[in-house]
């Protein structure tokens, strides 16, 4: 085959004409210091705060400190094999997690990667873990109840959908138990639950997942975990990741319940990170913006207006106190951010009152509007009567000769406390709560021995289920106790008492 030189020339000229030079530019920097899950990188002049950075070995990091000549970042993975002098590239993105329906029923880490051994998760895309909270005009007031199934809470400290209610108490007082009971009680109520475990032992999280599975609650739940063995940055981003997963459902008009267990460990993880990247310490060695990390997280809980789909995200953050000290830095911060708190006391817990809720200093600032009217009617005087009982009980220890009125109040108080006791993983339907609290508040239990109250409650509710199911149904339908319902309920109580006292 003979090719003429001029043909070769024209082919080369053609190729040169059509050649497009593409340069891929990557903003990169050099590691000048690494250790303890923290790196300092020289360069990266265009880096954004919170930006995702790519380190060698497919490890990612997050830029936190933008200084004059270097960037302080935290690693979202192992620093093994990464050394000084290695190249770090910008990604131009901020930290994102997968969202979607397929996350339901799964256990994932802070980055949304499955850790339950059930294979990959199909997602509906990725969303940034840090987004602004809904504005005032996008919200509506809290007006729908979120039933916890716990008598002491639903009657005296009601929670509404879209509220932020803090659960606070010492270690081993039943804080997580209240949160898990609330998740179990959402069965069949079309609420998606997200449990975020921050700095917990892996064995504890495994127990919680087993409990939720046994109770059938994993069918509508997501568990996000950053265990105690994981790095501080992963513990720090866990609640934001969980919140983003929840917002996906809220924006679709669904109702979401999210539990942060617990924000004390979250603050400690943030303090660790901040001190390592040499931010100046403040009170209790926490950095100055520790209030802001919790306020921007909890402000994302909302009840959206009808125009925005009417979805809601209810947050139950948990805080662990030391020796009941609610005046410490982190507890006071979170109390001031939330719409109320459920305070659990060690003394009550050890005295056998479980859940160990102290109604004196527990409060719900917005949930009262969401409580159903029938519950308001029966529990209106409950908090006051319990407070009076506690006061009288402390005086009664000193004097033996008490007048009849005081004795009657003490006897009633004992029965009210007994009625508010409840076993773990046994949430109660709201109509049943109303019936038994009505009986206690209206003096129907004064002739029942205190030791028999639990037995009376169990048998009474079974009796109402079999003989007077229409009363419970009427309470749910009407949502108010009218005279007709009251007289039907009273006659049913009297009827059952005759059988019980035989």
Swiss-Prot record:
Keyword Ion transport among UniProt keywords: yes
Cellular component terms (Gene Ontology): plasma membrane; proton-transporting ATP synthase complex
UniProt cross-references to Pfam families, sorted A to Z: ATP-synt_ab, ATP-synt_ab_C, ATP-synt_ab_N
Membrane topology: Peripheral membrane protein
Record field: catalytic activity: ATP + H2O + 4 H(+)(in) = ADP + phosphate + 5 H(+)(out)
EC numbers for this chain: 7.1.2.2
UniProt site positions, description: Required for activity: 362
Subunit structure: F-type ATPases have 2 components, CF(1) - the catalytic core - and CF(0) - the membrane proton channel. CF(1) has five subunits: alpha(3), beta(3), gamma(1), delta(1), epsilon(1). CF(0) has three main subunits: a(1), b(2) and c(9-12). The alpha and beta chains form an alternating ring which encloses part of the gamma chain. CF(1) is attached to CF(0) by a central stalk formed by the gamma and epsilon chains, while a peripheral stalk is formed by the delta and b chains.
Any one GO molecular-function label of the UniProt entry: proton-transporting ATP synthase activity, rotational mechanism
Localization (cell): Cell membrane
The organism's place on the tree of life at top rank: Bacteria
Major localization listed first in the record, in broad terms: membrane
Name of the protein in question: ATP synthase subunit alpha
Keyword list, A-Z: ATP synthesis, ATP-binding, Cell membrane, CF(1), Hydrogen ion transport, Ion transport, Membrane, Nucleotide-binding, Translocase, Transport
Keyword set includes Cell division: no
Gene: atpA
Cited InterPro entries: ATP_synth_asu-like_sf, ATP_synth_asu_C, ATP_synth_asu_C_sf, ATP_synth_F1_a_nt-bd_dom, ATP_synth_F1_asu, ATPase_a/bsu_AS, ATPase_F1/V1/A1_a/bsu_N, ATPase_F1/V1/A1_a/bsu_N_sf
Role noted for this protein: Produces ATP from ADP in the presence of a proton gradient across the membrane. The alpha chain is a regulatory subunit.
Family: Belongs to the ATPase alpha/beta chains family.
């Amino acid at each position: 085959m003979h090719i003429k030189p001029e043909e070769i020339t024209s082919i080369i000229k053609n190729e040169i004409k059509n050649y497009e030079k593409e340069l891929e530019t990557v903003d990169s920097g050099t590691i000048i210091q690494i250790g303890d899950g923290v790196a300092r990188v020289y360069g990266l002049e265009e880096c954004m705060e919170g930006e995702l950075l790519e380190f060698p070995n497919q490890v990612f990091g997050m830029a936190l400190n933008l200084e004059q000549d270097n960037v302080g970042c935290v690693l979202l993975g192992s620093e093994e094999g990464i050394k000084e002098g290695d190249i770090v590239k910008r990604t131009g993105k901020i930290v994102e997690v997968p969202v979607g329906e397929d996350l339901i029923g799964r256990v994932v880490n802070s980055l949304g990667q499955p850790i339950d051994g059930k294979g990959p998760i199909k997602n509906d895309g990725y969303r940034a873990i840090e987004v602004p909270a809904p504005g005032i005009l996008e919200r509506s007031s809290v007006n729908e109840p979120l039933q916890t199934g716990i008598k002491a809470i639903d009657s005296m400290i009601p929670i509404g959908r879209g509220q932020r209610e803090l659960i606070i108490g010492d270690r081993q007082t039943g804080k997580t138990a209240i949160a898990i009971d609330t998740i179990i009680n959402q069965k069949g109520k079309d609420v998606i639950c997200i449990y975020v475990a921050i700095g917990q032992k892996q064995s504890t999280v495994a127990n919680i997942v087993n409990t939720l599975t046994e109770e059938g609650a994993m069918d509508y739940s997501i568990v996000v975990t950053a265990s105690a063995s994981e790095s501080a940055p992963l513990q720090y981003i866990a609640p934001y990741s969980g919140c983003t997963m929840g917002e996906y459902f809220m924006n679709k008009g669904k109702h979401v319940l999210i539990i942060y267990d617990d924000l004390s460990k979250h603050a400690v993880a943030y303090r660790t990170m901040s001190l390592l990247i040499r931010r100046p310490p403040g009170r209790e060695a926490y950095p100055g913006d520790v209030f802001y990390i919790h306020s921007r997280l909890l402000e994302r809980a909302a009840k959206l207006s009808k125009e925005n789909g009417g979805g809601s995200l209810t947050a139950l953050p948990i805080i662990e106190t030391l020796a009941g000290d609610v005046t410490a830095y982190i507890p006071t911060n979170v109390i001031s951010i939330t719409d109320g708190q459920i305070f659990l006391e060690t003394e009550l817990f050890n005295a056998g009152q479980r859940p160990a809720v102290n109604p004196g200093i527990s409060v719900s600032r917005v949930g009262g509007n969401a409580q159903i009217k029938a519950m308001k009617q029966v529990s209106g005087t409950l908090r006051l009567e319990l407070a009076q009982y506690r006061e009288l009980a402390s005086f009664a220890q000193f004097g033996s000769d008490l007048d009849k009125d005081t004795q009657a109040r003490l006897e009633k108080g004992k029965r009210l406390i007994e009625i508010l006791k409840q076993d773990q993983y046994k949430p109660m339907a709201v109509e049943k709560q109303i019936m038994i609290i009505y009986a206690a508040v209206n003096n129907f239990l004064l002739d029942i021995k205190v030791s028999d109250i639990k037995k009376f409650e169990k048998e009474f509710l079974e009796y109402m289920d079999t003989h007077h199911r229409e009363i419970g149904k009427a309470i749910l339908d009407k949502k108010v106790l009218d005279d007709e319902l009251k007289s039907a309920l009273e006659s049913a109580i009297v009827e059952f008492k005759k059988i019980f006292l035989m």
